[in-house]
Amino acid sequence: MGISLEFRRKLFHILGGLLWLVPLFYLQKSLLLIFSLFVLALNLVFVLRLAEDKIKPIYKLIYLFEREKNLEKPAIQALWLNLGVFLSFLFFTKECATVGIVLTAVGDGFAGLIGYHFGRIRIGQKSLEGFFAFFVSSSLALWPFVGAFALLIAFVGAVVEILPKNIDDNFLLPLVGSALACII
């Protein structure tokens, strides 16, 4: 039995999200913004399928992580995440953006993993178990950065993640987490 699509997706979400911490800590702000714009442009090429016939191996890799409903616009959720991360870099301090990235990568990743595999109590298209997984995992991951405020940020993040909305939570969560970190 192979690894489920949802497990692959969420593992990629967690690791890919946390990977943003490397340029955040090692590049000057101007280089960070240029790098982020490059990533967004590349991501947009994938979503719009502008080079699919030229880089088929990359698309085959992308399709390993993509849900059936997103095959027309592959990597669209990654684009939303990368846009939210870019705006966090642009508008918030490095420390605040770190909180937004960790909240999104860890909280949303574990909410999806637990909710998909163990979720029984449904709240719309999400689950109560996923909500608690978001809260617990992001509280633990954020504690070294913000101490007890991790509980508040994790709770607000879990609420944002579970509520039905027209805006992708991969876009909202980095901004919400970054803003909360700067406020407290």
Can you say where each PLM-predicted feature lies in the sequence?
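Hydrophobic alpha-helical transmembrane segments
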Residues: 1-184
